[in-house]
Design a protein with these regions (language model features):
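Short, small-residue-biased leader/transition segments that mark boundaries at the very start
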Residues: 143-148, 158-160
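Short, electropositive alpha-helical surface patch
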Residues: 125-142
């Protein structure tokens, strides 16, 4: 079971960048995008600093962000990897399910992927994420940076 001390819960430069961008969009009346907190149950609290030092997830979260951009509903997750491949185990089944349901309601679901070693960022639309997800069920458990750059060139809606 993941805890508050887990690597995935330390915050990231990517999320800080996204939060700053979302604040700028809000101030300029371009978008309203909210960071979705992961529900937790605190187990240990440092009495001096009043910081949570150990906590457990209450339930599975959906995605990191949900909002609307000029009337278009969006949901997305922020993912980072320090290597030249993105491990699909970093995307969870409940997130795929949520993004699928979101797209069925005419929203746009995607992942913003940051390759930290290269300092490269990619937009991965749900329609491409699901292709990789289905391949992972057949044994292909990651995809390289070069595939990310190919994906970001045209959206799925443009390809249909």
């Amino acid at each position: 079971m993941a805890t508050w001390n887990s690597r995935g819960l330390r915050g990231s430069a990517l999320e800080e960048l996204i939060n700053f961008t979302n604040d700028t969009y809000l101030k300029n009346h371009l978008a309203l995008i909210q960071k979705i907190p992961t529900p937790i149950t605190p187990m240990k609290i440092d009495r001096e600093t009043r910081h949570i030092t150990l906590a457990y997830f209450d339930k599975k979260s959906t995605v990191d962000y949900i909002g609307v951009i000029q009337g278009i509903p969006v949901c997305f997750d922020a993912k980072e990897t320090a290597v030249d491949t993105f491990p699909l185990q970093n995307i969870h089944a409940h997130q795929i399910s949520f993004m699928s349901d979101f797209e069925q309601q005419k929203g746009i679901a995607f992942i913003i992927l940051h390759y930290t070693a290269r300092n490269e960022y990619y937009y991965l639309p749900y329609c491409d994420i699901i292709k990789f997800w289905e391949r992972s069920e057949k044994g292909v458990h990651s995809f390289p940076t070069r595939r990310s750059s190919e994906i970001g060139r045209a959206s799925c809606r443009e390809r249909v």
